[in-house]
Amino acid sequence: MRVDLLTREYPPDVYGGAGVHVEYLARELRRLTDTRVRCFGAPRPEEGVAAYRVPGGLETANAALQVLGVDLEMAAGCEGADLVHSHTWYANFAGHVAKMLYGTPHVVTTHSLEPLRPWKAEQLGGGYTLSSWAERGALAAADAVIAVSEGMRRDMLASYPEISPERVTVIHNGIDTGEYAPDRDTGVLERHGIDPSRPYVVFVGRITRQKGLVHLLHAARGFHPDAQLVLCAGAPDTPEIAAEVTALVRGLDREGVVWISEMLPRPEVIQILTHATVFVCPSVYEPMGIVNLEAMACETAVVATATGGIPEVVADGSTGLLVPIDQAADGTPHDPDAFAADLAERVNRLLADPALAARMGEAGRIRAVEHFSWERIAERTMELYRRVARGEAPVPAG
């Protein structure tokens, strides 16, 4: 069976969890079947990977139009595939067109949902309407839909009631615990100005409304003064949020704030995660949150928002602490001050008890190893492909 994975992100251009997912899923699927990858951007040297640039004439168009232009070329390349599997709205339209054009079965993995990310209008303008349209059409017509968490499945069926529950199955994201493992060296820390002899709180993520960095920076005013704050944060969605975050960082009245804005190589991130006392995930929308698994695999305690699929990853009181959030329709907290205070309280609880933080970190790695292996995820995905190819229901009866 030839499977074409359709994605915006693929190494070396990986910015978020969806890109990480496709990278590792492709690696494991290649052991099981003929797997091709079709991605955005510059050509890749890897065999079996085709990349597509924005078509000529669309260079100055709205970003959403550029995406749809790439998708049309990507769909043309899918001729001959036995099944196409698209990831995120950026590639959903390509899979949808390939299904219509060639009759190829189409599987969609939902890593997020456009109706639950209204702040994307700040980035895409009117293109947000296009992204929502592309996602809805692909999901409605797909032969099978994979949700990366039970929370995502619930959100999807609520957002798109036209989707039959029998077509939606849950297959979690995973983690390579051989690669993501504790690194006790400190050279990376010292090079970036992090004092390895002092405790620190770390955030790793893009500067977006979704990732909640603004809320973390408000909470940081209440962190224990002895703790460093390390922000591995870049790729802002808009100039406006970049300016807001910059002002908040400058306004922190504390020493030991380290802001690394460039994208770091994975081994450097692993070392930074390893030595942190606490990893913080303040997201207001997170269908799964691979980054929490990455921290857990590095034996680091996690403080994360109790939203989306995060509670399926972070075991509250065992591998970390969850922060309750009372959310508005757009995901933002009704009471931002209370959310920031609760975030600070849980971070400080672990800073004050490093032995507890260490125990949670150890439990987190065990959980990551036992429940989130990419090998098992690829096997379950392959089982779904076979069912779809045979024309069977994606979710077995009973």
What feature does the model see in each segment?
Residues 242-267:
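Nucleotide-activated donor-binding/catalytic signature segment of Leloir-type glycosyltransferases, i.e.
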Residues 104-105, 115-137, 154:
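Nucleotide-sugar donor phosphate/pyrophosphate-binding loop at the beta->alpha transition
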Residues 301-304, 314:
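Short hydrophobic beta-strand element within catalytic cores of glycosyltransferases
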Residues 42-43, 175, 228-246:
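Glycosyltransferase donor-sugar binding loop
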Residues 20, 199, 203-222, 243:
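A conserved mid-protein helix/loop that constitutes part of the nucleotide-sugar donor-binding site
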Residues 284:
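Aromatic "clamp/platform" in nucleotide-sugar-dependent glycosyltransferases that forms part
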Residues 151, 174:
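Carbohydrate-associated surface elements
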Residues 86-91, 110:
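Short His-centered aromatic/hydrophobic patch
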